[in-house]
Amino acid sequence: MTRHIFNIFPTTIYVSEIFNHKKYKDAFYKVYPKYDYEQVTYEDGEEWVNTTSENTGNPFIHLDDELEELFENIISETKVYIHEVLNYQDIFDLIITKSWISRSRAADENIPWHKHSTSHISFSYYLNTPPNSHVLKFANISNLNGLFDGLNTSDIKDGVRESNELNASTFHINPEEGSLILFPSAMEHCTESHSDDFKGERLAIVGDITLVYKENGDNDYSMGFINPKYRRTYK
């Protein structure tokens, strides 16, 4: 008997190392005070632990002249992801729309599940990862191989014989210092502590990238974003 198996529609996460990481790490620490923020704040008497600086009004690390070369490297790796890995045409300009700090200073400082709904590709560049740092975790939202709710997701008892890429409902990466992780912005993700024995500061620069058609393109695609050159802003 002949059987055929087609594993279709994978989701691709791209991990690379940033060349000259120490140089860029040192450069960031020189400007770190400009982007620092209160890790713990209080609102209506309730304590809030802020694991990112995204909502502090300063998500513009990519505009810092001292870090221009770093972000050029990130864009270069993103082009590899788009053109060489995903095999799309070279028809886009890439725009970093915002960038911010992701930071944990205690084992229980986790970032909850979320996605970056306003961009196409998101990145996380790991400046510092002490031993037992939090992992970056992704969710298989469509989860069609789950067959029915709970078969591969139950926290009490699931039906998975051995977890693999075909039946997994989640996947995590233990980022190394100096690594760059690129992934589709629409992917649900979070950070998760896998050890109580965590000390120090897990620190990353996180950002969003939007693809727009090249300025000199034909503009004959019905989907996607036209280059900002052709937009008009109303206030």
Identify the meaning behind each predicted range.
Residues 213-235:
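Long, compositionally biased interface segments
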Residues 87-99:
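A short coil-to-beta-strand element that immediately follows conserved catalytic motifs
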Residues 111-114, 189-197:
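Short beta-strand His + acidic residue motifs that chelate non-heme Fe in jelly-roll/DSBH
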Residues 27, 194, 216-220:
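Short conserved micro-motifs at the rims of enzyme active sites and ligand-binding pockets
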Residues 182-186:
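Short, proline-centered helix/strand-breaking motifs
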Residues 1-88, 110:
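Non-heme Fe(II)/2-oxoglutarate
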Residues 127, 187, 209-211:
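Short beta-strand segments enriched in hydrophobic/aromatic residues
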Residues 101-180, 201, 205, 215-223:
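Catalytic core of non-heme Fe(II) oxygenases with the double-stranded beta-helix
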